Amino acid sequence: MPPRELSEAESSPLRSPTPPPGRGSASPELGIKCVLVGDGAVGKSSLIVSYTCNGYPARYRPTALDTFSVQVLVDGAPVRIELWDTAGQEDLDRLRSLCYPDTDVFLACFSVVQPSSFQNITEKWLPEIRTHNPQAPVLLVGTQADLRDDVNVLIQLDQGGREGPVPQPQAQGLAEKIRACCYLECSALTQKNLKEVFDSAILSAIEHKARLEKKLNAKGVRTLSRCRWKKFFCFV
């Protein structure tokens, strides 16, 4: 069942779920900062709203810089993930770059039915990310996947003399070229692969933080195996 449509009042701001009584004090909460970047109107805000609220924004509202916070359980351990929704407009480049340095994982987003947004991944977004944060993992995310086979969208692309939807093999090839953790396509409207996108982001961030702590020889830090942390993700 697709998510219900949210009014503007419902979708902004988001409220953080309250942890169950006693769970928060049982074990320390791991914090993860996840930043979404990409051209304007590719659906970054919709991804966050659909994932955290099980709803879909009623209308497009350009974002300057919004933050959202939710708690999830990863193999029974509490994890707080901060989702940073950034603007794609050039006049906000300086503001956007301020949130990059301490980011644990990036979602580089493009719309599968906007070839120009795909091109800008290598021309704008990856260079911008790496200028301010050379090490954090990056996931390449194709958004609006529900429109890939939409007849009206295909007609509009053809009439406008533009290219068709971005082919999946081409996107996968780019992910390998830029050394992204993976390439995933999803839809905020239907929620297809939506959870997989954020699960993968959380896993990549956890492994990245573990590697950094290991390099710093922090006492008591153990390497987190992929299979252990991938077993279970759920909202608290």
UniProtKB/Swiss-Prot annotation:
Its main location: membrane. This is Rho-related GTP-binding protein RhoV. A lipid is attached at C234 (S-palmitoyl cysteine). InterPro entries: P-loop_NTPase, Small_GTP-bd, Small_GTPase, Small_GTPase_Rho. It comes from Bos taurus. One of its GO terms (molecular function) is metal ion binding. The gene is Rhov. GTP binds at residues 38-45, 85-89, 143-146. One of its GO terms (biological process) is establishment of cell polarity. Keywords: Cell membrane, Endosome, GTP-binding, Lipoprotein, Magnesium, Membrane, Metal-binding, Nucleotide-binding, Palmitate, Phosphoprotein.
